[in-house]
């Protein structure tokens, strides 16, 4: 009989996502995840099999979380693109998006999420304006940690609506 897992997968996945966000995907190794979680590297190998599967599982788990929070935000947000973007408080990080692009299934999840958000942003309006608004929102997220906040999303919404 196997021992009970003392550290849930969600905690392991959070550590993997932190490593990806802070140091890049190459920083994820059984040893670095072991240090971050307190599990032994052999325990991680036993749990996930191989490194690519462990990373894939973490990214898949994160896409499931993002899709659920997006559905909640869409259901609860007031009408209009600005309200929706404010409600989407935890979009995928640029590092997570980059890591997802290397895997066909994750790339499909990212594409479907983007399309879903763009449709919600467009409402009955212009689909091209919604695509530009989505791109501006993601671009802002990309540069948020690097530069000061000179760009205001609400100004883009006014111009594109």
Question: What role is predicted for each listed range?
Answer:
Residues 82-114:
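Amphipathic alpha-helical segments used for helix-helix packing
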Residues 64, 68-93, 133:
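Hydrophobic alpha-helical connector segments
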Residues 107, 111, 123-161:
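Hydrophobic/aromatic-rich alpha-helical bundle segments in the mid-to-C-terminal region
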Residues 9-11, 15-53, 57:
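Helix-turn-helix
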Residues 1-6:
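N-terminal intrinsically disordered/low-complexity leader segments
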Residues 54-62, 109:
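Alpha-helical DNA-contacting segments of helix-turn-helix folds
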Residues 11, 15-23, 69-76, 96-99, ...:
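Solvent-exposed, amphipathic alpha-helical segments
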Residues 115-122:
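An amphipathic alpha-helix signature
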């Amino acid at each position: 009989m196997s021992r009970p897992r003392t550290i849930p997968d969600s905690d392991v996945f959070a550590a993997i996502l932190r490593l990806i966000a802070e140091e890049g995907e190459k920083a994820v190794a059984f040893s670095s995840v072991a240090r971050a979680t307190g599990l032994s590297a052999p325990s991680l190998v036993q749990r996930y099999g191989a490194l690519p599967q462990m990373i894939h599982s973490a990214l898949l788990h994160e896409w499931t979380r993002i899709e659920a929070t997006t559905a909640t935000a869409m259901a609860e947000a007031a009408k209009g693109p600005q309200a929706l973007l404010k409600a989407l408080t935890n979009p995928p990080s640029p590092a997570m998006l980059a890591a997802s692009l290397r895997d066909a299934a994750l790339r499909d999840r990212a594409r479907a999420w983007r399309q879903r958000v763009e449709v919600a942003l467009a409402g009955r309006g212009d689909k091209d304006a919604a695509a530009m608004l989505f791109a501006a929102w993601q671009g802002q997220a990309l540069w948020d940690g690097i530069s000061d906040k000179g760009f205001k999303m609400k100004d883009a919404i006014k111009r594109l609506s």
